[in-house]
């Protein structure tokens, strides 16, 4: 009985070795035909943590959970008219350029304002701009830029303006049922793999439409079919709320609006978080305003009455004066911003990193000393 069991174990082991050998040969052939990294075991992946690029807004980075837009993914930004969709996307463009990357803007709406983009921090001399004649042309241009691997961010503004060539060539009133949806579905199938491979961030701006005859539930939908909804790793719903009034002589003038950005879909962090930002007309998202609000909630900036203080030093009476102080002192702004990001776990604390490095160095030194002692003990000196 024991002999029979042993033979069975030997057969199982031999069969298992042959299967493993066959698998190893298959993996080698796949890598030979399609390149290294075409297939791998999940635990062997070099990068486990999702790489991100800051959105250009601290509040939005926190709401996204990972600290910004994930690289190699598709992002959809949608909302009503004049809600701030393009502003949010342009802040991403400015951030990509700030980090030394190259950004492209596919302006299908033919409505990009260069002076406004420059006011938001975009280097318009370095920005790649295309104003395509049709939806196919715009998506083809985006595809070629992504395939090059040289572009870090591509913004398409907007999906609703990507009109199929057949519709442009036809007459007004002609029926083109599902034409744009089929075009977008094909584009998503072609672009998604290339976007992931080149680690390019693709931002699609979209509009809203109303579904006819909806009695219950949300009647709002986005044009372009369902493909973009499925392929997008992050979907942002941008809504403008109350108007912001000016101060002093401009107290009756609208100088901006409070905007809510809701993360309605997120594949890299928990969804449904919200970011509240102030979009100032002609300036974009108020970075000092959102920093003061978040830092005050975390008690990094202390508020007593109308006064704001940091490190026991008063920085301004009222939020406007505090904003001005941070704008005039970028080193203080950066210091507070870093503390907030550390609190939310978006970045590692420098002091903790230095302590970990010192501890690791100490352990390595101890191991080297132990090995040296063992070698010294083993060596016999002959006279």
Curated annotation (Swiss-Prot):
GO CC list? cytosol
Q: Which InterPro entries match?
A: AAA+_ATPase (IPR003593), DNA_recomb/repair_RecA (IPR013765), DNA_recomb/repair_RecA_CS (IPR020584), P-loop_NTPase (IPR027417), RecA-like_C (IPR049261), RecA-like_N (IPR049428), RecA_ATP-bd (IPR020588), RecA_C_sf (IPR023400)
Q: Which SMART domains match?
A: AAA
What is the recorded name of this protein?
Protein RecA
NCBIfam families, per this entry? tigrfam_recA (TIGR02012)
Query: Which SUPFAM superfamilies does this entry report, sorted A to Z?
Result: P-loop containing nucleoside triphosphate hydrolases, RecA protein, C-terminal domain
Q: Name one GO molecular function term.
A: ATP hydrolysis activity
Q: What does this protein do?
A: Can catalyze the hydrolysis of ATP in the presence of single-stranded DNA, the ATP-dependent uptake of single-stranded DNA by duplex DNA, and the ATP-dependent hybridization of homologous single-stranded DNAs. It interacts with LexA causing its activation and leading to its autocatalytic cleavage.
Q: Which domain of life is it from?
A: Bacteria
Compartments annotated for it: namely: Cytoplasm
Give the chief site where it resides.
Answer: cytoplasm
Q: Which GO terms describe its biological process?
A: DNA recombination; DNA repair; SOS response
Family to which this protein belongs: Belongs to the RecA family.
Query: Is Transcription tagged as a keyword?
Result: no
Question: Pfam families attached here?
Answer: RecA (PF00154), RecA_C (PF21096)
